[in-house]
Design a protein with these regions (language model features):
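Alpha-helical transmembrane segments of multi-pass membrane transport proteins
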Residues: 1-422
């Protein structure tokens, strides 16, 4: 039966059926073949979205869009540039640091790439940085958007695995920081090798002015994450606070949004949220079909049998599958499908589910910068006008750096579990 459900899923994908429909139709095939009453389908679809934690998903998506289009990201980037732009290759370092900071607000890789790319790519080109390298760096740094909290994929994983969203968020800090540091070191190496120029030297007064201008945006991560970890509000409530705060700043402080642009922004975010929530709902039906035939348990049994219950080999097999899945599937849909499949194997080798949730998120995030799907490369390509192939070559070493961090946190779980307190 596993061959039927996965075969149907990949067949629908190959003929161009959207991912959400492919998941739902594959599950429907199993329902029909097994003679399960079809009344179960709408009930299971409803259950898929019937979780308070999922309220965070559309709110974080909207907050990311407001951040990118409300003038907040531009001012954060300008402040970072005033601090570091004076050193050789400083603007490329700013690209990564800005991505890390904006990741702490948006919760989305594509939103992070769009926000930083729109602000910095034109200036990088003007300063004689190679456009393909700059686009690749920002696209790869955008993957940090779903690792440093808040993170939409981590919210989805928490709902499926029954884990704490706050602990997953804490677990993402160190891996996200390591990803950023790796990319910064690569950017410094390339800047010296290609003799990229130093930027403008700002006076202390100018730096202070940039800081004051960006302060409202700089306060946002502290309000969101501080509120979550201090227990003032839940992650779902934090998402609503993020939207309210970014809207107030964008409309009344920076005056970068009017009603017309706000309407378009809300509609666009609503469409994106609807697609994500539809994928979540159909994945619940898909997961029900898998559980009905005990396919996750069968896969776990096969993995444990092949590896002799060796945790190192089990994690290695899972890591490779995660990286491949991330190359061909959107992050949220891949996470929703893979989580129930791999959890029995992780439990079987005594793995920590918070650790695995962060590992899964990082692995799938790398797929955002790995063709053929590579949504972050698409975003960078749209901003620069470069074809994807031009960005793919310089992004390869950056993806390898991210993969090194991925395997490091897999086999050194303390890097993930230190802050959650395990």
């Amino acid at each position: 039966m596993g061959y039927l459900i996965f075969g149907a899923f990949f067949l629908f994908l190959l003929i161009g059926v959207p991912i959400g429909l492919s998941i739902g139709l594959a599950a429907l095939v199993v329902f029909l073949q097994a003679g399960i009453p079809l009344q179960m389908v709408p009930q299971t679809l409803f259950e898929g979205n019937n979780s308070f934690s999922l309220v965070a998903v559309p709110f974080f998506i909207l907050a990311g869009d407001v951040l990118a289009r409300g003038g907040i990201s531009e001012r954060i980037v300008a402040f970072a540039e005033s601090c570091l732009g004076r050193i050789r290759g400083g603007l490329s370092i700013v690209s990564v640091l800005a991505s890390m900071f904006i990741a702490a607000i948006s919760g989305s890789g594509a939103a992070t790439t769009a926000a930083v790319g729109a602000s910095l790519l034109p200036e990088l080109e003007e300063r004689k940085y190679d456009v393909d390298f700059s686009a690749a760096l920002i696209a790869s740094a955008g993957t940090i958007g779903v690792v440093i909290p808040p993170s939409v994929p981590m919210v989805l994983y928490a709902v499926i695995a029954g884990e704490s969203v706050a602990k997953l968020f804490l677990g993402g800090f160190i891996p996200g920081t390591l990803m950023g540091l790796g990319l910064i070191l690569w950017a410094i190496y390339i800047a010296k090798k290609r003799n990229y120029p130093a930027g403008k030297k700002y006076s202390a007064k100018e730096v202070w002015h940039k800081f004051v201008t960006a302060l409202w945006g700089l306060m946002c991560p502290g309000i969101i994450l501080g509120g979550i970890f201090s227990g003032i509000f839940t992650p779902s409530e934090a998402a609503a606070v993020a939207v309210l705060y970014t809207l107030l700043v964008a409309i009344f402080v920076y005056k970068a949004l009017d009603f017309k642009h706000f309407y378009k922004l809300v509609v666009g975010s609503g469409v994106t949220s609807a697609l994500v929530m539809f994928i979540i709902a159909t994945s619940k039906v898909f997961g029900w079909g898998l559980a009905f035939y005990q396919i996750p348990q069968a896969i776990a049994g096969a993995m444990l049998s092949v590896t002799g219950n060796d945790a190192f080999l089990v994690y290695l097999m899972i890591d490779v599958i995660i990286l491949i899945a991330g190359m061909f599937m959107e992050t949220a849909s891949a996470l929703i499908i893979l989580t129930p499949i791999f959890l029995p194997a992780i439990i079987g080798v005594g793995g920590n589910l918070v650790h695995f949730g962060v590992v899964l998120t990082v692995g799938l995030a790398i797929g955002m910068a790995t063709p053929p799907v590579a949504i972050n490369i698409y975003v960078a390509s749209a901003i620069t006008g470069l074809p994807m192939g031009k960005i793919t070559k310089p992004i390869i070493p950056m993806v390898l750096i991210l993969c090194a961090v991925f395997f490091l946190i897999t086999y050194v779980p303390g890097l993930v579990l230190l802050l959650p307190g395990y």
